[in-house]
Curated annotation (Swiss-Prot):
GO BP: any one term: mitochondrial electron transport, ubiquinol to cytochrome c
GO cellular component, one term: respiratory chain complex III
Function: Component of the ubiquinol-cytochrome c reductase complex (complex III or cytochrome b-c1 complex) that is part of the mitochondrial respiratory chain. The b-c1 complex mediates electron transfer from ubiquinol to cytochrome c. Contributes to the generation of a proton gradient across the mitochondrial membrane that is then used for ATP synthesis.
Keyword set, alphabetical order: Electron transport, Heme, Iron, Membrane, Metal-binding, Mitochondrion, Mitochondrion inner membrane, Respiratory chain, Transmembrane, Transmembrane helix, Transport, Ubiquinone
Record family assignment: Belongs to the cytochrome b family.
Lineage top rank: taxon: Eukaryota
Name of the featured protein: Cytochrome b
One protein family per Pfam: Cytochrom_B_C
Positions contributing to a ubiquinone binding: H201
GO molecular function terms noted in the UniProt entry: metal ion binding; ubiquinol-cytochrome-c reductase activity
Binding site for heme b b566: H97, H196
Binding locations of heme b b562: H83, H182
InterPro entries per the UniProt record, alphabetical: Cyt_b/b6_C (IPR005798), Cyt_b/b6_C_sf (IPR036150), Cyt_b/b6_N (IPR005797), Cytb/b6-like_sf (IPR027387), Cytochrome_b (IPR030689), Cytochrome_b_C_euk/bac (IPR048260), Cytochrome_b_N_euk/bac (IPR048259), Di-haem_cyt_TM (IPR016174)
Amino acid sequence: MTIIRKKHPLIKIINHSFIDLPTPSNISSWWNFGSLLGLCLIIQILTGLFLAMHYTSDTTTAFSSVAHICRDVNYGWLIRYMHANGASMFFICLFLHVGRGVYYGSYNMIETWNMGIMLLFTVMATAFMGYVLPWGQMSFWGATVITNLLSAIPYIGSTLVEWIWGGFSVDKATLTRFFAFHFILPFIITALVLVHLLFLHETGSNNPTGLNSDADKIPFHPYYTIKDFLGILILLMASMILTLFFPDILGDPDNFTPANPLNTPPHIKPEWYFLFAYAILRSIPNKLGGVLALILSILILAFMPLLHTSKQRALTFRPITQIMYWTLVADLLILTWIGGQPVEYPFITIGQTASIAYFAIILIFMPITGMIENNILDLD
């Protein structure tokens, strides 16, 4: 068996990636989220595949086809709710994975980090298009509002929006193409994940100290396969509790009403995992400025390696920057809350303050605290 594992051209790749992979001996549970994201992706592809067998991407039948899946298809309700809540679990793992990367300075592995940012954008696009497919009120109006933001692009904006819509409004053509893209993108994501892993295995994993761990590596299997398995069990248990006991808790009640272009919901808002970015978008009165801030709220991650001023990699031994980091986390939670609130006083002011704080912490305060810590520890 050992000979096959190490010699066979295909099994050899799996062996080097998941079995004999030299891994730092001290990586904590924060390093579990990579494998959990892989599991989420597999669950989403499988449940999505079965949903696609029964779903129809036509404006007249899309809503009723989802109802048909829940009522008439064997375990259709389970597949549908696993897919919908699976997206939420996916984003929880994604945010924790990115947060871990920021905390422990993993962004210094630039190729892996940039690949991760590309993955984040692709997953967000996929989730957005998936939200449109049930063709409820929030699906329709969410699609209308978000796609309409592209009209802010100078000169080509209006033409671009009509091109994406396939007409003069969100309609049958839009739904059909969104379904096509939503179906194909997870497979593109899978390919990007392989490239992400390829880059990661070029440098090896980071670890909680942020120090070079070449002197202390252990094989991935059995030590981290068993650790990942525990994480997988916890994730599956959490997913099942969410799916079986609270299936609609993260959804919007407006989506139980079929899409009606003549009736606008009182508060148009996206799924919870986009609310922080939506709050940043809304906090800027200018349309183009809002769109740029929306894109920058994620793209700012790409500037992290350039903004790293500390002589240490991780925040493990940097208490001042730790305060900044946890303030940033609190700020993101505030933005998420504000994104779900109506556009009125005091929410507008809170949203604008939190948006300024978000960019200020990343662009100004964290680099400054890094330099202060260098001076305190005399690392210059």
